[in-house]
């Protein structure tokens, strides 16, 4: 990394150290990052951080799985078998590595006052869903459909027993949502592959959901590096 960029990065980005790496699902690793600069941040459930993964200009975005105000956050990073800088960083990050990352950001966040909460997405969405679900009290009304490649790809989500788990290749996610038929009046959080997100949004709109009550986040699309 060019030395001239370091002062700029110190102003724009936070610094932390990887303190734990754990295989969390068949294709996800959980990274714990700690540092004084991470203490006391304003973090909303569902937000994300941009991480430097190679050169000073190469960043990838990851949802925050868990945040501790004392100065620690956890990311769950998916190994998608690619060979780009983000995929390599996700596979190779190790305890002791320094990490530079931006402050948590994004508007795809929990609406805690909603009458009920509907979660629809795939593995890439389930990390943000995990933070949102963990922030909901036990009595919250929760439903949804989460798609994974195998049962071993399922994250340990709070309220998981109230979700319909869909194996990829069995029932298309939009069809699963149609079968679930969540009643309008709450908030729907829809994230994952871009075309699927759009299709699910149409299913909900056709079922009477107000567009303002359907929060969407296309995390990826085939053949594209990212949609941030």
Regions found by a protein language model. Give the residues of each.
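Short boundary/loop segments of OB/S1/cold-shock single-stranded nucleic-acid-binding domains
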Residues: 1-7
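Ferredoxin-reductase
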Residues: 8-92
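Short, structured patches in soluble enzyme cores that scaffold and shape functional sites
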Residues: 35, 53, 77-79, 103-105, ...
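Hydrophobic N-terminal alpha-helices or hydrophobic patches in metabolic proteins across all domains
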Residues: 36, 61, 107, 195-197, ...
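Active-site catalytic pocket residues across diverse enzymes, especially alpha/beta-hydrolases
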Residues: 37, 136, 204-208
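Active-site beta-strand/loop microenvironment that shapes enzyme catalytic pockets
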Residues: 85-154, 186, 190
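Reductase modules of NAD(P)H-dependent flavoproteins
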Residues: 145-228
């Amino acid at each position: 990394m060019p030395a001239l960029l370091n002062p700029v990065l110190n102003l724009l980005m936070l610094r932390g150290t990887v303190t734990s790496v754990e295989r969390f699902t068949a294709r996800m690793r959980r990274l714990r990052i700690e540092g004084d600069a991470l203490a006391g941040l304003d973090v909303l459930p569902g937000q994300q951080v941009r991480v430097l993964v190679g050169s000073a200009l190469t960043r990838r975005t990851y949802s925050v799985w868990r945040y501790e105000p004392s100065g620690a956050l956890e990311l769950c990073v998916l190994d998608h078998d690619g060979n780009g800088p983000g995929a390599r960083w996700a596979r190779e990050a190790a305890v002791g590595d320094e990490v530079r990352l931006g402050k948590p950001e994004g508007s795809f966040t929990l609406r805690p006052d909603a009458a009920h909460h509907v979660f629809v997405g795939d593995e890439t969405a389930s990390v943000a869903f995990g933070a949102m679900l963990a922030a909901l009290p036990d009595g919250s009304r929760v439903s949804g459909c989460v798609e994974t490649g195998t049962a071993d790809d399922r994250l340990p989500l709070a309220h998981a027993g109230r979700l319909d788990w869909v194996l990829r290749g069995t029932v298309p996610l939009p069809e699963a949502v149609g079968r679930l038929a969540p009643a309008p009046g709450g908030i729907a959080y829809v994230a994952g592959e871009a075309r699927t997100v759009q299709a699910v949004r149409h299913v909900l709109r056709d079922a009477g959901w107000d567009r303002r009550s359907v929060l969407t986040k296309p995390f990826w699309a085939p053949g594209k590096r990212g949609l941030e």
